[in-house]
Amino acid sequence: INGDPKKPADQPRNITIQNSFIGQGLQPHSCGGLIQTTINNGVTLYRNLYIDNKTRNPKVKGLNQFVNNVLYNWGNGGAYIMGDTEQKSDADIRNNYFIVGTTDNYDGKKLGATAPFTRYNEHFSAYLSGNFYDNKDGVLNGRELERADCMKKSVVAGEEIITSPTFLERPSDIHPEIKGLMTAQEAYEWIVDNGGASLPARDG
């Protein structure tokens, strides 16, 4: 999802993607999605399953609501990628479940998985709450992610530098209310039982 930066009046806006399976992007550039809007025009990603994509699960710039999604078996390219740009972004990231998989590449090599959140900086403002991370022990028993999981330390010229998004204490008012908000565990169970195309019960 992307607009022409030369046409400010012609930007993607008020888009919701929900109850979808977004997976197995074509190799060798296996991506879940690129979501780029302006700071005033948003995309909501709600109750989706991102599965078996090496990177961009998704990659986000602009205004984004990422709630009650399950991410499984992303690779070494990134799970939720936070812009990596000087463009201002504002995200509401709540109650998602990040589950590490086997991370096998199409050529049989092991990729390994990145941290759930990557490529952040101070230009990316985010409210993070209720997100869980689970390893690959075969049991869904993840731990809740903390702000420290979205911070990176480096040393530049002998000085320690901490890079992080700008953490918000609550979601910005510009984001719409999600009335069917679930916990990460409830979202996982709902997606397993109901996700994807559902005719005629839901999508008729």
Labelled PLM ranges:
Residues 1-56, 63-76, 90-102, 127-134:
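Right-handed parallel beta-helix
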Residues 57-59, 79-82:
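Short catalytic-loop micro-motif centered on adjacent basic/acidic residues
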